[in-house]
Amino acid sequence: MNPNFTTEHTWQGRHDPEDGQAGRRVHHIACPIQVGELANQEPGVALIGFECDAGVERNKGRTGAKHAPSLIKQALANLAWHHPIPIYDLGNIRCEGDELEQAQQECAQVIQQALPHARAIVLGGGHEIAWATFQGLAQHFLATGVKQPRIGIINFDAHFDLRTFESELAPVRPSSGTPFNQIHHFCQQQGWDFHYACLGVSRASNTPALFERADKLGVWYVEDKAFSPLSLKDHLTQLQHFIDDCDYLYLTIDLDVFPAASAPGVSAPAARGVSLEALAPYFDRILHYKNKLMIADIAEYNPSFDIDQHTARLAARLCWDIANAMAEQVQSIRHP
């Protein structure tokens, strides 16, 4: 396995020599390396690209997300960087044709190798990325002897992505719509608790079968129409309880949770969605617990339908916020 590496052109941007080190931007500190080299580097934040939309195609969605990882990195490159902590670009895992399961396995292997040395952010790609991300995290815990890890999965998404991936009634396969059901089955097999929250879910975009499955599995969810200033305090209290019940956090953001006006470049644009301003307090609360945040991913950016890079810039800003929190945690460990 040898991930495809991002070109030097990706990590280019503005340079202000008059500011010296204080003019530092992400492209100045981003370091493309092989995952096997991380053990010899100082701790940092690792970026892993997942060039795949085979799961979106299986889920009858609009393809194009496989082109997203490098474009998100390009949008990230010119943002300011305020930490002495490096960002490592571990390249992009590429899915060839319909070889989804193989690509997910390869991505999980890179994640497992990276986590002992860095916090990780995975850039998709369709939301089938979530199965790869969780598998990498789970393999890390199994390899390091962590027993019964209480992993809190927090998904900002218009969809539950709890679809059936095995059925005697219809020819179904794993897709971008199945990852959290796959994760539930894996946790069941391992004897692990399944802690799953879905924030921003749309009742118009999820069938009764999916709501019934979410209720049966004990999913905590907040519908898109329920986000308002009046409900903020109660929802943050619920989020706090969710975080308190978990030892580790996995944050996953499907960009179709945002309104189509903010995120036009997705497979399934949201007619309603939830604004970044409304979701910001929830992101902030999660990132406050950076000591628990092991890994995150950003899914479903589809550059084929983007307008003036609006969605790429949104994805890059979210990635930047997460990377900042992770860098603060790495720095606190290095210099307690």
Curated annotation (Swiss-Prot):
Catalytic activity: N-formimidoyl-L-glutamate + H2O = formamide + L-glutamate
Disulfide bonds: none
Keywords in alphabetical order: Histidine metabolism, Hydrolase, Manganese, Metal-binding
Amino acid composition bias (Polar residues), ranges on this chain: 1-10
One annotated GO biological process: L-histidine catabolic process to glutamate and formate
Amino-acid positions noted as binding Mn(2+) 1 in the UniProt annotation, renumbered to this chain: H127, D157, D161, D254
Database matches in PANTHER family: ARGINASE/AGMATINASE (PTHR11358), FORMIMIDOYLGLUTAMASE (PTHR11358:SF35)
Name of the protein in question: Formimidoylglutamase
